């Protein structure tokens, strides 16, 4: 049994999360995860879910009675989601810690918006295919 299971059970007790009213109005995350089967789609959803948990855990960082549980689960998330890659985890936490109400963050985000949108565009990845087609046409024309 993974160490996080015992600690998650500990958190369930602490938050009284086993009570029947917790199931009211369905699940938060599990239904969404069921909707997505492709790995890349699931990773997008999982990143938002992991971000939520990191923010939740941050709210309880000073609560000594659950500190061990929170740290154990965060470490296990690091292994499972970030493949124990500290740089990836640090960058992820950096992104989740930006405050959308901070004027400097807002200004920088707007300044970078065009470049970020270009990175999101699948058209960026089609350049290689076009070159290959051009090379092929060039060879055929010279034969």
Curated annotation (Swiss-Prot):
Residues recorded as bearing Pyrrolidone carboxylic acid in the entry: 1
Positions annotated with a glycan in the UniProt record: 25, 97
One matching Pfam family: IFN-gamma
Keyword Transferase: no
InterPro entries: 4_helix_cytokine-like_core, Interferon_gamma
Superkingdom field: Eukaryota
Keyword list, A-Z: Antiviral defense, Cytokine, Glycoprotein, Growth regulation, Pyrrolidone carboxylic acid, Secreted
Localization per Swiss-Prot or TrEMBL: Secreted
Gene3D superfamilies noted in UniProt: 1.20.1250.10
GO biological process annotation, one example: adaptive immune response
Molecular-function GO terms, alphabetical: cytokine activity; type II interferon receptor binding
Predominant location category: secreted
Gene Ontology cellular component annotations, sorted alphabetically: extracellular space
Entry similarity comment: Belongs to the type II (or gamma) interferon family.
Role, per record: Type II interferon produced by immune cells such as T-cells and NK cells that plays crucial roles in antimicrobial, antiviral, and antitumor responses by activating effector immune cells and enhancing antigen presentation. Primarily signals through the JAK-STAT pathway after interaction with its receptor IFNGR1 to affect gene regulation. Upon IFNG binding, IFNGR1 intracellular domain opens out to allow association of downstream signaling components JAK2, JAK1 and STAT1, leading to STAT1 activation, nuclear translocation and transcription of IFNG-regulated genes.
Subunit record text: Homodimer. Interacts with IFNGR1 (via extracellular domain); this interaction promotes IFNGR1 dimerization.
Protein name: Interferon gamma
Organism of this sequence: Pan troglodytes (Chimpanzee)
């Amino acid at each position: 049994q993974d160490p996080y299971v015992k600690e998650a059970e500990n958190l369930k007790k602490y938050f009284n999360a086993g009570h029947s009213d917790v199931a009211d109005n369905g699940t938060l995350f599990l239904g969404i995860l069921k909707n997505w089967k492709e790995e890349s789609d699931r990773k997008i959803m999982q990143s938002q879910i992991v971000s939520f948990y990191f923010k939740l855990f941050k709210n309880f960082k000073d609560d000594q009675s659950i500190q061990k549980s929170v740290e154990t689960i965060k470490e296990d998330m690091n292994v499972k989601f970030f493949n124990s890659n500290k740089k990836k985890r640090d960058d992820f936490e950096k992104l989740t810690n930006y405050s959308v109400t901070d004027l400097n963050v807002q200004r920088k985000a707007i300044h970078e918006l065009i470049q970020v949108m270009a990175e999101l565009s699948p058209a960026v990845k089609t350049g290689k295919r076009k070159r290959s087609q051009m090379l092929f046409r060039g060879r055929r024309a010279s034969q």
